[in-house]
Amino acid sequence: MLSTSTLIGLTYAALAVLYLLVLPFLFLVYVDKRWNYSGAWEKVLMFFLVLFFFPGMVLVAPFMTFRPKPRSL
């Protein structure tokens, strides 16, 4: 069985991974899909979440691309 301090450390590590990697990735995917179709209040929420998850955005954003899809001519 794990000691209390080990469980606390694992909990902190899990929360750090969730805050710095998982939630910013999911949020960036959501913003990519909804940006052109969202209303004013939804964009306010998006801006708030960008500020809230800013450290994770700095870590995750360089690995994502938001280039437009190629057009068919």
UniProtKB/Swiss-Prot annotation:
Stored InterPro entries: NADH-quinone_OxRdatse_su_L
Keyword Transmembrane: yes
Reaction(s) catalysed by this chain's protein: a plastoquinone + NADH + (n+1) H(+)(in) = a plastoquinol + NAD(+) + n H(+)(out); a plastoquinone + NADPH + (n+1) H(+)(in) = a plastoquinol + NADP(+) + n H(+)(out)
UniProt keyword annotations, A-Z: Membrane, NAD, NADP, Plastoquinone, Quinone, Thylakoid, Translocase, Transmembrane, Transmembrane helix, Transport
Membrane topology: Multi-pass membrane protein
EC numbers for this chain: 7.1.1.-
Function of the molecule: NDH-1 shuttles electrons from an unknown electron donor, via FMN and iron-sulfur (Fe-S) centers, to quinones in the respiratory and/or the photosynthetic chain. The immediate electron acceptor for the enzyme in this species is believed to be plastoquinone. Couples the redox reaction to proton translocation, and thus conserves the redox energy in a proton gradient. Cyanobacterial NDH-1 also plays a role in inorganic carbon-concentration.
Family according to the record: Belongs to the complex I NdhL subunit family.
The name this protein goes by in its record: NAD(P)H-quinone oxidoreductase subunit L
Organism: Synechococcus sp. (strain JA-3-3Ab) (Cyanobacteria bacterium Yellowstone A-Prime)
Record lineage: Bacteria, Bacillati, Cyanobacteriota, Cyanophyceae, Synechococcales
